[in-house]
């Protein structure tokens, strides 16, 4: 409901704000102290007062909310009387079936992505290594660069074709949708397909992007798609999924999908559930925990099952897109906890630094490059060229080392493949340190960084690696290619962690720098996205051991605290940049002394219970409000007593199907041809546009009875409410419209997301 | 607000139900179909229609709710205007400090309990084994029995002294409190102390009880105590903790405390967080996740640190009250998943069976033994005798086995102490199988059951052990001693799991029965308490490995489904037995076609905004309602227009301090001596009883202005609401009173927990 965009039409509708002035208002007992210094526009509501430009503000104002409340009208109530226990069971059972399919599909997608990436990277390194092994530096580089550029070009092209929603990780959009913000087409089929293809190509291209963020978006999109199972383009609306075709059930499936995407990507089902609880979801229930867990397990199991195949080995082991065989025998000392705290501090600082630079870079991009596909394509290609050059030529800075330098400790039962290093242009029996980290898959680099073998790397290459990966992570995030931040951040963290571990091992004995790498990764992740439990669990699930729980937890905590001192998580900032009015679970303290009557939209357009079609059409045409309180004029005829609320879309459907009132007096007449099923089916589609409905004179003179179709259980508040309490009510109940009534039950205002944000 | 217990006094207050009869009611359009077949008493609301006896119903009706909403009155608003950012920061910082202390204290309690139990059990077995090694069966048994009886006697005595709230696990009470039910003294100092002592003694006595459930209760009690930091008996109310002294903040600390108790008991911080999210807490927020996690880590770390000591070994490893060195090398095959499903099925069946028998046994206890301490004490001693006899003499059923039969596989790097068996009365070099399981600590028995060594036990002793432990778990739960169910259930599960594993290993090769024991434990736990993610995480944290995630998850899921088919979780049933009106997150389907006007209490007692003391005292004396809507009589004087709501306790404080109205007309006069601090301090204490206030005639003729003290942001609903939507609003917002208004904003009803349950 836009704020006072239009004057109401109906003659019954008048500004009655002054009408109740003789009634005691608990805010105004001391003159007009409050009424002056809070104007409606000065509501700053974020924990940190971000300054939004007028354009950004306007953009946010235009964003609509999703409709999480049940439309509890007469039809619904009649339907309830008919529904048996069997139907409820059927609906619940159907949800489990959808979850099963969701898990299997997301698992398969994760498998396909992993396989195709493996294939593409294999091809790239196959051709490049052909020249490398022949010692042809120039040719090798050109091949490397050429293939990378091709991948980035195609990846960026996919984004241009499928729209910018296919780029980046998509987590801010998912978070916004789960908070109740309508982000158009974010979970559409085009964005889904574009993201999958773009992700495969960008991840193969050697850019510093990871697959996890996009997998979360992909999971959410699959969840939205499979639960709705309709197509507006194809006009395909099967009735089987009708009962799930509302924003509320859709939200639950999107929550599940997001968790599932992460679970499949990391092979971490518990981590997935916690990610959904802690980070993306705004509404949660116990039932959802259980269903999400089920779906995550199915997805992780599917990926795992496909990766191993059933024929080759009957043993099973759970692996995800990224798993490390981490050693389990070493224990650390109490005194080392101080070092882990230090790693947490570094992680928090670097994380906050990352967020700062990334956000400013994205702002610059938004201003300079805008949505221009040529500039965006050029930028992506440019980043790719620089990345390729640096990754290729950085290896030449340092001398080659002898493979025989690496001594594997006997106490470690480690996967030996981790220690295979990259020879690059080194003589036989020697290896290139930076080449082993930069010239290959990120997975392999991470495995090497997490390796137990302490003397694998020297300090300078680790430092250079950390700086390079930090720099390119910042630069690559926000390009018009699909890509997440988890893996790049883990690389940065593992880099500085191992660097630190090896540094202090010069003074102290028995330091295992692999733990430091692990802890560094966790700290870095906590530093940029400010999650806690979720990161700890993911790290535990990745490394398959709980021995390092205490150091990881310590580092994550400190990192989060340090990061929070400087700025908010990268998702919060990105949501703001993308004009997604996200409502935090609590309003900021600065709103404590605002009253709801200061911020509510005062010129509410209301509809009478029985309304002439002519009037209705005029009212609908004259504004763009999405909901209208339905009023009863009461015994004194100039009143507008609140009775219920009805959505514009529902009125449009009623008008389109000519559900006119044929009764008399106060009796309610229900159209036989327009029962609950019909109403639900039609309102779940996109509503017909008003302009295409042509009413003849007779129809315009008819009446529509809104009472059977309005929501009689809509939450309202009195105008004595404080902002804070109204916010909590709005946020906790997931409302879209919150009518404000006065002492006489007359509608005096309307609160929507835009008034609260 | 009890339902229509008294007739209202005020002359303005009349039954105005018929007044709005000419106004359209969306429920009544088809005659009086609805109005007849829903009477107020027929609301059955549980998923399964439990039949409550009239006495039980009456008991539940008398139970009050906690007050989670902010009392947003004029004083509060004035206070907000004064509060600076620094004060908010101070409050947040204070919460972290409280969490830190909470973690340390709970960790220390867990350590003390573990140490004392170790000492007591050590003494017991020291004296018993003295006779055992001399071959004196009779003397050994009498010593064993005598010490067990002494422990049980003292443990039961503690419960008799401290009240029945110190018995059992206390999880239902904590769950109820977190849902908003006022369970008197459940978290009091007496219950806390009684529970700690009783737990130590009962756990040492060889009864089939575990320490985890009580630890959760202890954690919650510590959380409540430390955050409130007051004593009503000692009249000690420091102002430092004033801002946390409300039900809302207390609830959060209790949630954290419950998680922390579990985390300290199991050494499983993530499991603790998930337990709080999944099982006990009804209200959760993202901030809470983070704070709970911090506290859990602190507690687990404290216990761990104390157990290991800093001097002896500089290495650290995380262990809780119960940890197993589980082997990590073995992988299972896909075909075995079927077996794990079967274990899930068994776990679900046994779990449901356990719940069924336990509930009926408790019902029998409640009817026959009542609260009679002698009977209760006798019962506990009787169970102890039978347990001691069975645990002691069962070992003689089976022949001794040669210690040399146990072959430790070389591939396993296991803690060798696990395989040390109990010799009991066997010749040297031999051991008693049942003695190793029943004659010793539960921890040791569990360790042996989870041991990798396959040929440690034969099938018949395992079967007998499973049956014995199932039988005694059922019998012991509900005795008047403190004790939980986690460990006994794990033992049952491990028993049948290992039994099953060893049985099928007769036909198939390479079966590791230790995995089966682990999976069996998980299945059994899921079968009786119906948790999912939490159990999986606890098992992972206990065994320190994620390799067996898939089997555990599979078994837990199937077990939960199977169990849910038969009955609800043991906590749901116990809450009902304890007359705790717990509100599930969703109302049951059977309430779909009830309207809120059918169930609301119709004879609401209202108060005018400015009220004569005489009238007020009369009204307060004439009923036991806890809140009163404050009304304005409007321009037509016989109306009762809703303006706000005020609690009885707050009125009592106002009366006690003679905060009388001295103004005139509509102007509001605030008493200078009764500001926000004073109001908060006084209302956070127990209110003075009305009977002790003696008013003189002048005072009785005075007026009280309720407007500055009433809650102006109280949520209300219209009488057109459906039961389901009102329930959701009430439950999600954690309300205590929900006034119902009609089309004229007149108060026509009141909804409280008792109307919804």
Curated annotation (Swiss-Prot), chains A, B:
The keyword Cell membrane does not apply. Residues 1-96 are cytoplasmic. It is a multi-pass membrane protein. One of its GO terms (molecular function) is chloride channel activity. It holds the Pfam family CBS. Keywords: CBS domain, Chloride, Chloride channel, Ion channel, Ion transport, Membrane, Repeat, Transmembrane, Transmembrane helix, Transport, Voltage-gated channel. Residues 600-667, 710-757 form the CBS domain. GO terms for cellular component: chloride channel complex; intracellular membrane-bounded organelle. Signal peptide: none annotated. It is found in: Membrane. It comes from the Eukaryota. The chain crosses the membrane at residues 97-117, 141-161, 196-216, 253-273, 292-312, 337-357, 378-398, 462-482, 484-504, 506-526, 535-555. Voltage-gated chloride channel. Chloride channels may have several functions including the regulation of cell volume, membrane potential stabilization and signal transduction. Belongs to the chloride channel (TC 2.A.49) family. This is Chloride channel protein C. It comes from Dictyostelium discoideum (Social amoeba). The gene is clcC.
